[in-house]
UniProtKB/Swiss-Prot annotation:
One protein family per Pfam: BTB
Species per Swiss-Prot/TrEMBL record: Mus musculus (Mouse)
Function: May play a role in organizing the actin cytoskeleton.
Protein name per the record: Actin-binding protein IPP
Expression across tissues: Expression seems confined to tissues derived from trophectoderm and primitive endoderm.
Keyword Nucleotide-binding: no
A GO cellular component annotation in the UniProt record: cytoplasm
Keywords of the record: Actin-binding, Cytoplasm, Cytoskeleton, Kelch repeat, Repeat
GO-annotated molecular function: actin binding
């Protein structure tokens, strides 16, 4: 073959995966045979013959030591302080082989030494080893250790583990050895996986009682993260009465009294704003229950007169994702309002067979029973209900021959309703929610029988209403909920379009309503509530066809604001419309 016929050599680069390993293995042999070693490292009573180049290439610590102009760079013998010889041997073996022997007995010393010598790979390997060893009995110790050595990756991992396994962790001996600040940091977390807030209170008290003499002075600080409005008052009082130490019992009684007074007598300050937004809301990872209360049910294709008011109550478990039945209301009712205060569920007003109620019932999740409490001053259905500053507000609604325009306030401690103001625009079957100490009223039906677009805000402190930009669509029988500093108006009904599946969101930053993803099913008279950063919509009624009465729905949809999508989850046991919903 002539030279001209030879194929032109391609300009390709090839690499060998084994090259680096072979070089490293050969350097380790040279170290073992003490060939070309150019420095001795004195660690304790041991001396190690090594190569400056290998160590400097493996660690910024040694690179600075040998090339940074330090006096050690020219010495034949360099002393390494702060490391035990056996641990240094393991680290030196890693530098020359890429392999390190990690065990339960040496991992803590190893990670400290590796961190000092800036051997990041060994630090990461030790962290991975410790993560694999973690359990509810040792996680507190690992948390404290990672905090001590400022290992942020391990600290974050152990914190998350403590949050997820809190119910097991807080019963262990290590938990009682936490410092005050460490305990408070844990108890403040939104990520605690708990059944209810009472477990956080018990964990805090358990820590205090372990060394009451020294820890008594920290009672206020340690209990500050506890969300007292979520605790059933009778259960809390019963615990306090059982405290044997007189001084501690008095301190707890005083603390509880002061807290209740602050919640009941709010001032326009940041502290009360904080109370509203954080203390009343269940923790993000707490086990939560959705209570679907009352309403009416009607089969698809049935007559208008076939609707039946419900007394049944269902509970949805956010952990198991199942619906179960709980104790029924004493009085079947639809068009009612539902609220949660002090760990209790309240069912307010409503109607059955054109009889409008002023009665209020209260459900205790501990005793699993409904009891009757004080009645409103005016019977009303299609009312708006929300909780603000530890009290229940009942707004507007239908009171018989006309729309009620009064606002009533219920004090759970005094078991008393009082009229505190009036609606700026009389309305019924509207949406209502609370956000940052203000009450918002959206849509509904007016005195003239028209579906409304209007949107207003009420300040319970000044007792004044202010108008806000109206919705794009007229909506009555809608669902309303606050989520991520926005207010959502969901579904509903108007005479022109019948049941709606569209959803609007009001952005306070942009001061306008925008449409977001529509529900999969048109709904009017549904219930809406926010849980763990998601929006849950349950029940309602569908559109009517051929003049037939619309059937009630048992389906449930969940809205994710980040993906702007709706997902269907498990259906309720009973289809229902114009009921109430609460989260506990």
């Amino acid at each position: 073959m002539s030279k001209e016929e030879c194929p032109k050599a391609a300009d390709n680069s090839f690499s060998s995966d084994k090259h680096a390993q072979l070089i490293l293995a050969q350097m380790n042999k040279m170290r073992s045979g003490q060939h070309f070693c150019d420095v001795q490292l004195q660690v304790g009573k041991e001396t190690f013959q090594v190569h400056r180049l290998v160590l400097a290439a493996s660690s910024p610590y040694f690179a600075a030591l040998f090339t940074g102009g330090m006096k050690e760079s020219s010495k034949d013998v360099v002393q390494i302080l702060g490391v035990e010889a056996g641990i240094f041997q393991l680290l030196l073996d890693f530098i020359y082989t890429g392999v390190v022997n990690i065990a339960v007995t040496n991992v803590q010393e190893l990670i400290v030494a590796a961190d000092m010598l800036q051997l990041t790979e060994v630090v990461n390997l030790c962290c991975d080893f410790l993560k694999g060893q973690i359990d509810p009995q040792n996680c507190i110790g690992l948390f404290q250790f990672s905090e001590q050595i400022a290992c942020h990756d391990l600290l974050e991992f152990t914190e998350n583990y403590i949050h997820v396994h809190f119910l097991e962790v807080h019963t262990g001996e290590e938990f009682l050895g936490l410092t005050k600040d460490q305990l408070i940091k844990i108890l403040r977390s939104e990520e605690l996986s708990i059944e209810d807030e009472y477990q956080v209170f018990l964990a805090a008290m358990q820590w205090i009682l372990k060394d009451l003499g020294k820890r008594r002075k920290h009672v206020v600080e340690v209990l500050d993260p506890v969300r007292f409005p979520l605790l059933p008052s009778q259960r809390l009082l019963k615990y306090i009465e059982g405290v044997s130490d007189f001084n501690l019992r008095v301190a707890l009684q005083t603390l509880l009294k002061e807290y209740c007074e602050v919640c009941k007598s709010p001032k326009e300050n940041k502290f009360c704003s904080f109370l509203q937004t954080s203390k009343v809301r269940p923790r993000k990872k707490a086990r939560k229950y959705l209570y679907a209360v009352g309403g009416y049910t009607r089969l698809q294709g049935g007559r208008w007169s076939d609707s039946r008011a419900l007394s049944c109550v269902e509970r949805f478990d956010t952990f198991s994702q199942y619906w179960t039945t709980v104790s029924s209301l004493h009085q079947a009712r639809c068009g009612l309002g539902v609220a949660v205060v002090g760990g209790m569920v309240y069912a307010i007003g409503g109607e059955k067979d054109s009889m409008i109620f002023d009665c209020t019932e209260c459900y205790d999740p501990v005793t699993k029973q409904w009891t009757t409490v004080a009645s409103m001053n005016h019977p009303r259905c299609g009312l708006g209900v929300c909780v603000c500053y530890g009290a229940i507000y009942a707004l507007g609604g239908w009171v018989g021959a006309e729309i009620g325009n009064t606002i009533e306030r219920f004090d759970p401690d005094e078991n008393k309703w009082e009229v505190v103001g009036s609606m700026a625009v009389s309305r019924y079957y509207f949406g209502c929610c609370e956000m940052q100490g203000l009450i918002y009223a959206v849509g509904g039906i007016s005195n003239e029988g028209l579906e409304l677009r209007s949107f207003e805000v009420y300040d319970p402190l000044s007792k004044r209403w202010s108008p806000l930009p109206p919705m794009g669509t007229r909506r009555a029988y809608l669902g309303v909920a606050a989520l991520n500093d926005c207010i959502y108006a969901i579904g509903g009904w108007n005479e022109t379009q019948d049941a709606l599946h569209t959803v609007e969101k009001y952005s306070f930053e942009e001061e306008k309503w925008v449409e977001v993803a529509s529900m999969k099913v048109p709904r009017a008279g549904m219930c809406a509530v926010t849980v763990n950063g998601l929006l849950y919509v349950s029940g309602g009624r569908s559109s009517s066809h051929d003049f037939l009465a619309p059937g009630t729905l048992d389906s449930v949809e969940v809205y994710n604001p980040h993906s702007d999508t709706w997902t269907e989850i498990g259906n309720m046991i009973t289809s229902r419309c114009e009921g109430g919903v609460a989260v506990l």
